[in-house]
Design a protein with these regions (language model features):
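Short, positively charged patches
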Residues: 1-135
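Glycine-biased, small-residue-rich flexible motifs in mid-sequence functional cores and linkers
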Residues: 3, 78-389, 393-398
């Protein structure tokens, strides 16, 4: 917390979400040294506007904000903080400072998936969003969304019904009542989850705030689920960030392929997004992914930012680099096996007794339907309908 005032100074002087903050801080590898070099406006790379902002922003203003947050019960988490969301460090232009209300420790202790969509959804999309997010919450997956009306609210609601962990990422200050219809939900979310923003207290929502904010929603998660969006939906900005960050994009197949409300989803499905028919599709993707294998991203300046790139512009490259240096082939095989087993166990949770019997028969290899019927006392025609379970397991082994 000792460096919080200097991180805050950069945010106040150059505004939240400005990548110039990193261009000034990274060369020093220390935010205090960067502040000492920049605050008088003498840094060589600064333009006239930046110099004026630097000399008119005073460190005492930062101390006042810290005191205000303490009085309101808000936490200030900087990029250096151990409670900074790990995956968020691994994106281009991560937020230098997060203002939080709630239980960040609980959030960072589990995997997270983002869920976004339109503010004016169909009944179909609202129901399926709430259902899937609730099922993920029951399985200790955190759900991140943007706290807007419509499908964002449905995502949060589904998690809250299960007393799960959800994160609401705001496009305004924590103390700003927006949207006013969701004010009570803030306190409910903060019990097991967290309300987050990179914007200073008192900041009103503006159009550009939402666009800048969306990179945080996707950046905190291993994947982003889009449940309903037309071609102009703002939720597609979040999906685009997810793709650029090397994260998985999930989409709910449209309830009506001719309905223009789903045109944005259809585009992403055509481009290779993972179709989601239930929460199991998301769980399977996580437990067989690189994030399950290597989800420990610690705070290390040299590894996090290359000498010629501030910060990462392609997290997919980063993942490959980390895997090649940290995971040996034998270890990777063992981790994949472990992830497959966990995905298999989650599948069992949602099976009937007969399906579990068939799954047990298929776990060690393929069997003819007649052999399954003989071993389980299940009709062979019924057994055939269950043999798709082996396909899930085989795919995970590849």
């Amino acid at each position: 917390m000792s460096n919080a005032r200097y991180w805050l100074w950069f945010v106040m002087a150059f505004r939240p979400g400005n990548e110039r903050i990193w261009e000034m801080v990274i060369p020093f590898q220390d935010v205090k040294k960067a502040y000492d070099a920049v605050h008088e406006g003498n840094h060589a790379s600064m333009n006239a506007k930046e110099k004026k902002s630097a000399v008119t922003t005073h460190i005492e203003q930062c101390d006042s904000i810290i005191k205000y947050c303490e009085d309101k019960g808000y936490r200030i988490i900087t990029f250096e903080d151990e409670n900074y969301p790990p995956l968020l460090r691994n994106i281009y232009n991560p937020p230098a400072v997060l203002f939080c209300m709630g239980n960040m420790e609980n959030f960072i202790s589990r995997p997270a998936v983002a869920c976004v969509g339109t503010r004016k959804p169909s009944v179909y999309s609202a129901e399926i969003t709430e259902k899937i997010c609730g099922e993920l919450a029951k399985r200790e997956i955190a759900v991140v969304s943007g706290f807007a009306l419509g499908l964002d609210s449905a995502a949060h609601k589904g998690v809250l019904k299960q007393n799960g962990c959800t994160a609401a990422v705001l496009a305004c200050g924590l103390d700003v009542n927006y949207p006013k219809e969701n004010e009570k939900a803030k306190k409910m979310i903060a019990v097991n989850g967290v309300v987050i923003t990179e914007y200073l207290p008192g900041t009103r929502p503006d159009r550009w705030c939402f666009h800048v904010r969306n990179r945080i929603i996707s950046g905190m998660c291993f994947g982003t689920l889009v449940t309903e969006a037309d071609e102009k939906s703002g939720s597609l900005i979040t999906a685009a960030h997810a793709a650029e960050q090397g994260r998985t994009v999930f989409c709910i197949p449209p309830g009506d392929i001719f309905d223009k409300r789903y045109s944005g989803v259809i585009k992403y499905l055509r481009d290779g997004a993972v179709p989601v028919f239930s929460h199991l599709d998301i769980l399977y993707e996580y437990y067989t992914s690189d994030y399950f294998r290597n989800n420990d991203i610690s705070m290390k300046w040299p590894e996090l930012y290359g000498e010629n790139d501030i910060p990462y512009r392609d997290s997919r490259t980063v993942k490959r680099k980390n895997q090649s240096s940290r995971i040996k082939p034998q270890e990777e095989q063992e981790i994949t096996k472990q992830g497959t087993q966990m995905a298999y166990e989650h599948l069992l949770d949602d099976m009937t007794d007969e399906q579990r019997l068939v799954a047990a028969c298929l776990k060690d290899g393929d069997l003819h339907s007649d052999e399954i019927a003989l071993a389980t006392d299940i009709d062979s025609f019924q057994a055939v309908s269950y043999t798709h379970l082996r396909a899930h397991e085989t795919e995970a082994d590849l």
